[in-house]
């Protein structure tokens, strides 16, 4: 991740496993990282778009093991880093070590456990380190300086900056607060910083990268396309078009930053 990247998020199993694999391959061309969400029945950090995608996947009988199978298939064709996103409950129920080893065997590069606070993650971090599994933690605009440093140090892949307060979902534009947060994180953090929540356009990506982000994380905008077009060639075309627009925005933002 030397140049800024697009981190593309999909919910695995939405609308089915075969479609997810096709969508991952479609996004791969323009993505530096793919974030694969494991469907969960109570996704508290996610907005209506991703909650609905979780429901679609789970109503089709989707299981965690299927996420690992999808990733194994993807690994036959691509070395693009994949981060698995989940909540703590499914990891705990499976056994932390068991989950981490299965994710590693499937080809995951890192994990995001959205609702696991850093102060409660000691055992999880030890297990991830033991199995050479990357970790990503989240920070919000109101995260104090010391906590921001700790989250940065605990995040081996990148620190996930939440652009604004609330849940995931597309929005029109970003407030100055978001840009100030990126600048603050840039000064404080030694590792990579990627910004998520609300990014859906090339112009969004451009402005966030220009301010100093190493990547933008886009989820709801891709999931909306899948909701509209389902398992179809049209969905693949639309996903590729949006990924290209976002990628171009990232390139423009990087150029502006380096002028």
Swiss-Prot record:
The keyword Repeat is assigned to this record: no
Pathway: Amino-acid biosynthesis; L-tryptophan biosynthesis; L-tryptophan from chorismate: step 5/5
Entry keywords, A to Z: Amino-acid biosynthesis, Aromatic amino acid biosynthesis, Lyase, Tryptophan biosynthesis
Signal peptide range: none
Major enzyme class: lyase
The reaction(s) this protein catalyses: (1S,2R)-1-C-(indol-3-yl)glycerol 3-phosphate + L-serine = D-glyceraldehyde 3-phosphate + L-tryptophan + H2O
Gene Ontology MF term list: tryptophan synthase activity
Active-site residues from the entry: 35 (proton acceptor), 46 (proton acceptor)
InterPro entries from the UniProt entry: Aldolase_TIM, RibuloseP-bd_barrel, Trp_synthase_alpha_AS, Trp_synthase_suA
Entry keyword annotation includes Chaperone: no
GO cellular component assignments: cytosol
Source domain of life: Archaea
EC number: 4.2.1.20
Similarity-based family: Belongs to the TrpA family.
Chain's role: The alpha subunit is responsible for the aldol cleavage of indoleglycerol phosphate to indole and glyceraldehyde 3-phosphate.
Assembly information from the UniProt record: Tetramer of two alpha and two beta chains.
Protein name in the entry: Tryptophan synthase alpha chain
Organism: Methanococcus vannielii (strain ATCC 35089 / DSM 1224 / JCM 13029 / OCM 148 / SB)
Gene (name only): trpA
